Amino acid sequence: MTLDNLKHSAILSTLFKMADDNDLLGASEFIKDRLYFATLRSKPKSTANTHYFSTDEEFVYENFYADFGPLNLAMLYRYCCKLNKKLKSFTLTRKRIVHYTSFDQRKRANAAVLIGAYAVIYLKKTPEEAYRALISGSNASYLPFRDASFGNCTYNLTVLDCLQGIRKALQHGFLNFETFDVNEYEHYERVENGDLNWITPGKLLAFSGPHPKSKVENGYPLHAPEAYFPYFRKHNVTTIVRLNKKIYDAKRFTDAGFDHYDLFFVDGSTPSDIITRRFLHICESTSGAVAVHCKAGLGRTGTLIGCYLMKHYRFTSAEAIAWIRICRPGSIIGPQQHYLEEKQASLWAHGDSLRSKQRQYQDRSVPQLISSMDNLSISTSIFKSHSLDRMEENDYAENDLGMTQGDKLRALKGRRQPRSATTGAIRVEDVKVHTRSPSQPLSRMKPPASSQGSISPLKSSKVPASSSSSSSSSSVSASAKRIGRSSSSSTNLKSTRLASSLGNLYEPNTESISSGKPPSPSSFTPHPVRTTYNYHYEVNNNNNQYSTTSSPSKSLGYNLNHSGPSGASANARLSAGEQGHQRNPPAGLSGLSTRHLSRSIPSLQSEYVQY
């Protein structure tokens, strides 16, 4: 090659680099001269110095109504695998890698959570550092996420909230992509395969309510309690908590050796203090995992699980909502969001008190402390029940005359098509396997007809905060297509799926999921006043034959009167002296033999927070 040719090549290389630099003006830099995030109006072409890629059409949220994110845990995992592979690719070694997104505000917010979460998980950035990078330069703020309700949005969940929730899950061992089984997650979150997701692995499982008989009804697959038995036993689920009206006989669970509790409150409403305390006590008194369900396993289920996260792991309300929605999209709806926000301070106080007592007893060599529920009260001036009277479930709200919120959400989820091939299983060569300052004035109420995302939540946060379930989607407008599809046309297909999926529920080679660790500090801002329901109902369905001495209701000796429309009452007195045989928990399970760990995923050292 002549000297002139060398000079010409060098000049061209310089010009290309200058052009690339112009394209990256205003882009967010995550790794200096290596990894960037940019919002572009048109699709760019990769050059000799820069590699562009986008995930806007690959990872798509499956909406219920107007909700659009955040993307679920499987999509986050696949994104991290994809980006790790690019960063380690020999052909891209000397290139700058740019994850670009469009000006579609919904896609842009989801893309920001993906790369921000990558920075938190792998680059060890704090959520605030990652968010600062996302809004640096000429980047505008991001559209806040909303709930899966049909009405107006009254609560904004920000990109920063999502990053803080992921960070908190990392700290307590809920999120570990070295052991995460993406195929199992995507299988069981499908309606035809059980519609279940772990929120805290090994402890709290959210799932859709079982039915008396396994069948396909109006195109929606329904599962009987027995369909869940093998999976529950494999994963050491010992207790089931039902929050909706009685559809199946609880004796079907108790006869199989499970504990079963009824803590009923109205679909779409918030729980009373009594319901919340009893739920927390059940979870705290159970050595195994607790499976929680309502109608769809989204609203009421997510709300009580959120209370547990706030009390035992000091999640903020926003962190809890974000993490639960990443695990199980569509969770926590409408007033339930504000309920969690208002309960945060009192739940933190009770959690701190419990941990303090546990430390004192541990110093005296006492192995475990079970808090006394009689002396606890979740104080609030807003969410108090007006009466302690109990009503039968059939007296109100959930009746057979119309569809409830849970019915509609279940129907929408049941009409979804199987996962798109764009997010199919990764090839073997690819896969080896808020803190909000107490003085912050930010309100989560969204003003009508105003532009979302105009305020950066980071700028109001002055205290650094510490921050793994639904399937991949095939289209942003999938909801409209699902709603318009006739149920009769899909019945045969759903029947076939249901028949095969029930076999999967009985599949013995299901991987167990490891449990998390203790909590970490944060802060909170209360929410404006609102009203609530006072219809609540609780029953311990466990008879003497299947009870254990550690059953919460037995230790408390509750005496409940449930009044029906005729004024008759049923007294459910549970004695602390009742005894039953002890059930040995199933042995721990080894990982699936077909699972591969990913070379593209660096070692994760979860930072457990010890109080």
Swiss-Prot record:
Matching Gene3D superfamilies: Protein tyrosine phosphatase superfamily
A cellular component term, taken from the record's GO annotations: spindle pole
Source organism superkingdom: Eukaryota
Location of the region described as A in the Swiss-Prot/TrEMBL record: 23-178
Localization per record: Nucleus; Cytoplasm, Cytoskeleton, Microtubule organizing center, Centrosome; Cytoplasm, Cytoskeleton, Spindle pole; Cytoplasm, Cytoskeleton, Spindle
Keyword list, A-Z: Cell cycle, Cell division, Cell projection, Cytoplasm, Cytoskeleton, Hydrolase, Nucleus, Phosphoprotein, Protein phosphatase
Pfam family membership, one: DSPn
Annotated region described as Linker, given as residue ranges: 179-192
Tyrosine-protein phosphatase domain boundaries: 194-352
Residues covered by region (Disordered): 408-611
Coiled-coil ranges (or none): none
Cell cycle recorded as keyword: yes
Gene disruption: observed consequences: Morpholino knockdown of the protein causes a shortening of the hair cell kinocilia in a larvae at 3 dpf. There are no other gross morphological defects in the inner ear.
EC number(s) reported in the record: 3.1.3.16, 3.1.3.48
GO BP field: cell division; cilium assembly; microtubule cytoskeleton organization; positive regulation of cytokinesis; regulation of exit from mitosis
Catalytic residues identified in the record: 294 (phosphocysteine intermediate)
Catalytic activity: O-phospho-L-tyrosyl-[protein] + H2O = L-tyrosyl-[protein] + phosphate; O-phospho-L-seryl-[protein] + H2O = L-seryl-[protein] + phosphate; O-phospho-L-threonyl-[protein] + H2O = L-threonyl-[protein] + phosphate
Sequence similarity: Belongs to the protein-tyrosine phosphatase family. Non-receptor class CDC14 subfamily.
Protein name: Dual specificity protein phosphatase CDC14AB
